[in-house]
Regions:
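Extended, highly charged
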Residues: 1-302, 306-488
């Protein structure tokens, strides 16, 4: 079934066929904090403050102020759903993405009238207003404004003509203005905007919203796995076995995802910076993946919007920042990156990788490692160091043996309790640049931290020493199929 998924609507149709994976409501909802507040209880999960849980995706059919639009949330807020949408098993997702990176299928131009341009609104229209055209929610009452959390930003380098797709923090700032936040030195489109600014040029950009989940997952790869010049839309093409189709924008010299629900066209303005919370003055941006509300930036870049195009009766897609949806989008590409790097260095040892919900998909990874010979003792720790190299934002790595389910944190903690000694099996790497959104990465937290964003990376080696394996066999139960006893 999943091979038929090519856009948001076919993805939702697939989930509709699966028990307990999609619910719809006709009760009107306010996109300002209420919508996210509802879904927090229904299925956000992740690092969201409890009570929350993993639950179904949800469609709100009646959104206050937007009579012709729906809002979908939580599509990727379950590893099981992501696997179904990509036609694989949950435990195979990282390896599948790793293969897709190695066998990319580049995007192609769409022929004909693009679905995303069925309705066109130009910024020159007298009644043009982003607030009315795009039902972007706020997650909490403290948010700087309405946020587009699942916008696929697509741009072209002004010198090299290479393309890139990335998800960025986008806040509606006015009727025809968006702010965009670039993590300093970490994102390709940020580098493109900086180069365009050096040249005194505007950077054309398209923002596609409501697309094939394969695009959303693929767009979250980062260097070194996908260096500058690698178009992550090629990963989505490989996942689907066919290229992503792009159409020419209506008002700027750029392309957009042809079957998106919405496309926002515009230009990143050189020399222009805006205060992210200039309209709310709350001091906050929005809830971020670590589970805290991030501070508003006073140096966001400015996008001058030139058009909004969309399908007829469009579906806005959104996510809650700290939800399980972010864990899926950030974590699974990280798993693929770690697996690919370690497999090249020491083939056959790394069995699997899981980037846990507790780390928001970025801060924590569990590596399932198989020691094949006495000389493999110590290689598990080398694998952890490679993981830190593959993904700089990673903070903690847990190492477990092949008989431990790396996707079950209770099993991981069991290994920690029975195969780990704190004075022997903790390896720390202090003073390493990590992720700026971790509030403990700050000199105020510890005098050993020289600058905000620097952390102590830690390895927890919960593997059995190779020469002691015979003493750590788990209880062996009878292997059988229990279905005979479960039939009614």
């Amino acid at each position: 079934m999943a091979e038929k998924v090519r856009d948001l609507r076919s993805a939702l149709a697939l989930l509709e066929q699966m028990p307990d994976q999609l619910i719809e409501t006709d009760v009107e909802v306010d996109p300002m904090a209420e919508l996210a507040g509802v879904y927090r209880y229904v299925g956000a999960g992740g690092t969201v403050k409890r009570p929350t849980k993993e639950g179904p995706a949800m469609i709100f059919n009646h959104v206050k102020g937007h009579p012709d639009a729906k809002v979908a949330i939580g599509l990727l807020a379950s590893r099981k759903r992501v696997a179904a949408l990509l036609d694989t098993k949950p435990e195979n997702l990282g390896k599948m993405l790793c293969k897709s990176v190695e066998n990319p299928i580049p995007p192609v131009d769409f022929e004909g009238d693009a679905p995303c341009q069925q309705v066109v609104h130009k910024a020159t229209d007298q009644d043009f207003d982003l607030y009315k055209l795009v039902p972007a929610p706020t997650n909490t009452p403290d948010d700087a404004g309405p946020y587009i959390t699942l916008g696929m930003c697509y741009a072209t380098h002004p010198d090299t003509e290479v393309h890139d797709v990335t998800i960025h923090r986008l806040c509606i700032q006015g009727k025809d203005e968006l702010s965009i936040f670039f993590t300093p030195g970490a994102r390709h489109i940020g580098a493109m905007a900086e180069r365009a600014e050096e040249l005194g040029q505007k950077l054309p950009i398209s923002i596609s919203i409501g697309v094939d989940p394969a695009i959303e997952i693929g767009s979250c790869f980062e260097p070194p796995t996908t260096p500058l010049g690698y178009d992550e839309l090629s990963v989505a093409g490989a996942l689907r076995g066919e290229p992503v189709e792009l159409c020419k924008c209506v008002t700027v010299n750029e392309r957009a995802i042809a079957n998106a629900e919405y496309v926002i066209e515009g230009e990143v303005i050189p020399g222009a910076r805006v205060k992210e919370d200039q309209n709310s003055n709350t001091g906050y941006a929005m809830p971020e993946f670590p589970g805290y509300t991030g501070p508003a930036s006073d140096q966001c870049w400015l996008i001058k919007v030139t058009a909004v195009t969309h399908r007829e009766h469009p579906i806005m897609q959104t996510c809650i920042g700290p939800s399980e949806e972010h864990v899926s989008m950030a974590g699974i590409p990280t798993e693929a990156s770690i697996y690919g790097m370690v497999e090249k260095a020491m083939p056959g040892r790394l069995q699997n990788v899981y980037c846990s919900s507790a780390g928001g998909g970025k801060y924590m990874a569990v590596l399932q490692f198989k020691k094949l010979s006495p000389s493999d003792e110590g290689r598990q720790r080398q694998a952890a160091l490679l993981a830190f190299s593959a993904f700089s934002e990673l903070k903690n790595v847990f190492l477990v043996d092949e008989d431990v389910d790396c996707f079950d944190m209770n099993d991981v903690l069991w290994a920690m309790n029975t195969r780990f000694q704190g004075d022997e099996d903790v390896i720390t790497v202090p003073g390493v640049r990590c992720h700026p959104l971790d509030p403990s990465n700050d000199p105020a937290f510890s005098p050993s931290i020289r600058d905000h964003g620097i952390a102590c990376k830690t390895i927890f080696d919960c593997t059995v020493p190779y020469d002691l394996k015979d003493r750590f066999h788990r209880a062996r139960f009878m292997e059988l199929d229990p279905e005979k006893w479960l039939k009614k």
